[in-house]
A protein has these predicted regions:
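Histidine-rich, glycine-flanked metal-binding segment
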Residues: 1-48
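Alpha-helical scaffold segments that flank or form the walls of functional sites
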Residues: 46, 54, 64-116, 138-154, ...
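His/Asp/Glu-enriched, well-ordered alpha-helical/loop segment
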Residues: 224-235, 253-265, 271-351, 355-357
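Active-site core of metal-dependent hydrolases
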Residues: 153-273
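Divalent metal-dependent hydrolysis catalytic cores, especially in the metallo-beta-lactamase
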Residues: 57, 73-102, 115-128, 155-167, ...
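Active-site gating loops and adjacent loop-to-helix segments of metal-dependent hydrolytic enzymes
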Residues: 77-88, 128-156, 200-210, 221-234, ...
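Conserved, mostly hydrophobic/aromatic
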Residues: 44, 122, 178, 207, ...
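C-terminal cap of metal-dependent C-N hydrolases
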Residues: 6, 336, 346-378
Length: 378
């Protein structure tokens, strides 16, 4: 396939007008045209890399934690229709027994239709009961390396991220023991600055949904956010225009740099569906517009109802983030953070030919997966 007349998002994080060649499912810049080759005229549209979501829980009425293959496939199909072509869905805080079932379904899943399942984000149970958010406090426990390794084996090596509250007893030891096996993210935490610094020194390198479920910044208690800034951690942002004020989103890009910001959806099963009553991790959730909250605790946000592509679009169109920065934060950075950037997150030669064509307002015109048009809205 040749995509002609596109404004291509280059590996240098700029746009360049030209043609994009895909051969055998992968980007092949400079390859000579073939007789009878399919040509897709972009007519000047943006050509963006397929997005990579490393933290979301579900969509279209299905939750990853349902441990249901049909549900997982429905999620993958929906995400692909929204330009998200690689997914690393998140578990919730559950017992090992419940997590086993989730890992079994993920390990058995076969890519080939919809977004590729490239990992699992283990959000809990190694978190703080004092910053529980929408997680279930019943299953919170100390970090357990043996348990993690059993789950990792069960998943077939799919676990790419493990969330940890470093201030909880024994959790720093877990970080030291396991950081060479999986990306460790500080999350759902009451940690102070010094303990966060110790966690990064021990091998943590990531922050889950920055600003949410963690101490904020003050001039006398800088907390984990300043520790993350000083140690060059990757930081997740939910840019649904509910979780974080636009000024704070811009502040984060300006301080951490667009090479360390990762946009996530943190979406739950209501994503792609109307307002109503849903669930997340076994807890009742009410969705009105873009806002999802625990039904019994309406001041507690329970994930988002917005897909990653729309979060990226809002970051640009509603929050003032430069397009080049937002695209990087939704493609290359998440792929790199979980170690799948040799295949996903970029339009560099050799990567999968995953392309989203979008107009000037970032409306999706077409989605190309490995050189095949899978959605065409032109």
């Amino acid at each position: 396939m040749i995509i002609k007349n596109a404004r291509i998002y280059t590996p240098e994080h700029t746009f360049k007008t030209g043609d994009l060649t895909i051969r055998d499912g992968r980007i092949a810049f400079g390859a000579p045209p073939l007789e009878g080759e399919e040509v897709l005229d972009a007519n000047g549209a943006y050509a963006l890399p397929g997005l990579v979501d490393i933290h979301f829980h579900g969509a279209v009425g299905h939750d990853f934690c349902d441990a249901d293959e049909a549900g997982l496939q429905a999620i993958a199909d929906f995400e692909a229709s929204k330009g998200v072509l690689a997914i690393c869905p998140a578990t919730m805080t559950f017992s090992e027994e419940i997590l086993n079932g989730i890992m079994d379904v993920a390990a058995a899943h076969k890519n080939g239709q919809g977004a590729d399942l490239v990992g699992i984000n283990m959000e809990g149970p190694y978190i703080s009961p004092k910053k529980i958010g929408a997680q279930n406090p019943k299953y919170v426990q100390g970090a357990d390396a043996a348990m993690f390794r059993r789950l990792q084996a069960r998943s077939g090596g799919l676990i790419k991220l493990v969330d940890v509250a470093p201030e909880e007893p024994g959790n720093l030891d877990f970080i030291r023991d396991c950081h060479n096996e999986v990306c460790i993210s500080i999350a759902h935490t009451c940690t102070d600055y010094d303990t966060a610094k110790a966690a990064f020194a021990a091998g943590a390198s990531h922050m889950t949904h920055l600003y949410n479920a963690m101490p904020g910044i003050t001039h006398r208690a800088p907390g984990p956010i300043i520790a993350a800034l000083e140690d060059g951690a990757d930081v997740e942002l939910i840019t649904d225009n509910v979780h974080i004020h636009p000024a704070v989103v811009r502040f984060t890009f300006n301080t951490f740099g667009d090479d360390h910001v990762i946009l996530i959806a943190d979406s739950m099963m209501a994503c792609g569906l109307p307002d109503g009553a849903y669930s997340l991790g076994g807890q009742a959730v009410t969705v009105r517009g873009p806002r999802a909250t625990l039904t019994e605790h309406p001041d507690t946000i329970a994930g988002s109802a917005t897909c990653l592509y729309d979060c990226m679009r809002r970051a640009v169109c509603e929050m003032g983030v430069p397009l080049e920065s937002a695209v990087r934060a939704a493609t290359e950075n998440p792929a790199r953070s979980i170690g799948v950037d040799a295949d996903y997150g970029s339009l560099a030669s050799g990567r999968y030919g995953n392309v989203v064509l979008a107009d000037d307002d970032l409306n999706i015109l077409a989605v190309v997966q490995k050189g095949k048009v899978i959605h065409d809205n032109r």
